[in-house]
A protein has these predicted regions:
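Short coil/turn connectors at secondary-structure junctions
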Residues: 18-19, 52-54, 76-79, 108-111, ...
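Acyltransferase
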Residues: 155-179
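Hydrophobic/aromatic beta-strand patches that form the interior of the parallel beta-sheet core
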Residues: 4, 23, 57, 82, ...
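Flexible gly/pro-rich beta->alpha loop and the following alpha-helix that scaffold active-site loops
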Residues: 2-58, 63-73
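Short, glycine/charged-enriched secondary-structure capping and boundary segments
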Residues: 36-39, 70-74, 97, 129, ...
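Short glycine-/acidic-enriched loop or helix-start segments at secondary-structure transitions
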Residues: 33-35, 66-69, 93, 125, ...
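Glycine-rich nucleotide phosphate-binding loop and flanking beta-alpha elements
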Residues: 29-30, 63-65, 120-122, 164-166
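Pocket-forming structural segment of enzyme catalytic cores
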Residues: 73-148
Length: 179
């Protein structure tokens, strides 16, 4: 039998209704391109969930899906959900480092994380809703220090792969408090 090709009709339908917590983890930029083509049809549903206060934890390159758009190494621009006013761009290389971060909701606490990325985010001006100040590591782009992540309503977005909740009780407590 011939191998079956999968297409848009085979893609999983997304329904965010009834969920209190949504986690989306990192992936390769080339895979996010395919995800963006599918997820964009659910823009209104993601916006409704965000506005209704659903708690999101979005880590690593999955953050690209929530900005306006992102560009891959081949020069193609992919639309994203548009919840936030940033764009992303894949670069040729890999940034791998540990991080020491301070959450804006508990600046006296330290969050430990690990980053493995080949993308940056770009804002018009400063990040209007950072999740962390950076003690050690990189911001949302190629600069060291500054701020990193997104905390807006109940949306937590970070480059840090963690293990974010297991390794950082302050993050776990804050997310549980918001559920």
């Amino acid at each position: 039998a011939a191998a079956r090709k999968f297409g848009p009709a085979d893609a999983e339908k997304i329904s965010l209704e009834g969920y209190d917590f949504i986690y989306i983890g990192h992936g390769k930029c080339r895979n996010l391109s395919a995800v963006s083509e599918h997820i964009i049809q659910y823009r209104e549903e993601f916006t409704r969930a965000f506005e209704a206060g659903t708690v999101f934890l979005v880590t690593g390159s999955a953050r690209l899906l929530f900005g306006k758009s992102f560009e891959t190494l081949d020069g193609k621009t992919h639309d994203a959900l548009g919840l936030f006013d940033y764009t992303g761009k894949e670069f040729d290389g890999l940034t791998v480092h540990d991080e020491l971060l301070h959450p804006v909701f508990a600046p006296e606490e330290t969050v430990f994380g690990c980053v493995n990325r080949s993308e940056n985010l770009y804002f018009k001006g400063e990040n209007p809703s950072p999740l962390f100040t950076v003690e050690m590591g990189y911001s949302d782009n190629e600069k060291t220090g500054g701020t990193e992540g997104t905390l807006c309503k109940n949306f937590f977005g970070t480059w840090s792969l963690g293990p974010m909740l297991v390794r950082n009780p302050v993050m776990m407590r804050e997310i549980l408090r918001r559920l």
